[in-house]
Amino acid sequence: MDLFKSFGGKNNSKNIAKERLQLLLVHDRADVSPKFLEMIKEDILNVISNYVDIDEAGLNVEITKEKRSDNTYIPALHANIPIKKMKQVIR
């Protein structure tokens, strides 16, 4: 189930965020600059804040390398985004 479909609203913002996340996965390294990671956080917050109020103090976003079953590594984006409350979305 697509989480954002249940909120309705702007499909364009969702697609932009999806494309940006896919670009992250193309990179074969997990070591990124703090500036790059901060840009990712801001983009994610901008999209998600259309649907929910976020506790930014508890926000944690990081990129790691995870080992796959074939012993290769793939970058992974981990985001812990505490939600204060859901926003009312017109359907």
From Swiss-Prot:
It comes from Thermoanaerobacter pseudethanolicus (strain ATCC 33223 / 39E). The gene is minE. GO terms for biological process: cell division; regulation of division septum assembly. Transmembrane segments: none annotated. This is Cell division topological specificity factor. Prevents the cell division inhibition by proteins MinC and MinD at internal division sites while permitting inhibition at polar sites. This ensures cell division at the proper site by restricting the formation of a division septum at the midpoint of the long axis of the cell. It comes from the Bacteria. InterPro entries: MinE (IPR005527), MinE_sf (IPR036707). NCBIfam families: minE, PRK00296.1. SUPFAM superfamilies: Cell division protein MinE topological specificity domain. Belongs to the MinE family. Keywords: Cell cycle, Cell division. The keyword Cell cycle applies.
